[in-house]
Amino acid sequence: CSCYPDWMAIPGSGCYKYVDTPKTFEEAESTCRHFSPGPYGFGHLASVHSTEEYEALASMVPGATDSWNPQVFIGLRLIDGVSPAWTDGSYYDYQNWCGNDPNAHPDGYGAFSGGSYCNGQWVDVHTFTNDQFPFKCKLPCIE
């Protein structure tokens, strides 16, 4: 798997970039979509499909600053609070939720929680709060 400079390759999964500039979920997805490796497809917020992929992405999250932070958006939407869907349209076949999450907000987004409480597991974030977090983008490999 070949990637652009400053992107991390995970063989069999894709290319990943940690973006430290906090944005809302929708702004982050839009930013990721602007990354495009030409004919190979568009970027999206990162989807996660295996323990190996999760561990590689978790290693990109800075160390804990408190019980919950840093929180980092991934490309997971929660429809009706419980139905997860990846922004890239891929199959939801892996999960790593913290505690009782997702806990039935009307709608929500998924984020890594790098703080000491969840230690990198996922938390759900209310859509109505317009929280801004750093985020992870994913691109197809450049072949």
From Swiss-Prot:
Pfam families registered for this protein in UniProt: Lectin_C
Tagged with keyword Calcium: yes
Key word Calcium present: yes
Keywords from the named record: Calcium, Lectin
InterPro entries membership: C-type_lectin-like, C-type_lectin-like/link_sf, C-type_lectin/snaclec_domain, CTDL_fold
MF GO annotations: carbohydrate binding
SUPFAM superfamilies: C-type lectin-like
C-type lectin domain mapped to chain residues: 11-138
UniProt cross-references to PANTHER family, sorted A to Z: MANNOSE, PHOSPHOLIPASE, LECTIN RECEPTOR RELATED (PTHR22803)
Biological role stated in the UniProt entry: May be calcium-dependent and galactose-specific.
Full protein name: Lectin 1
Organism: Stichopus japonicus
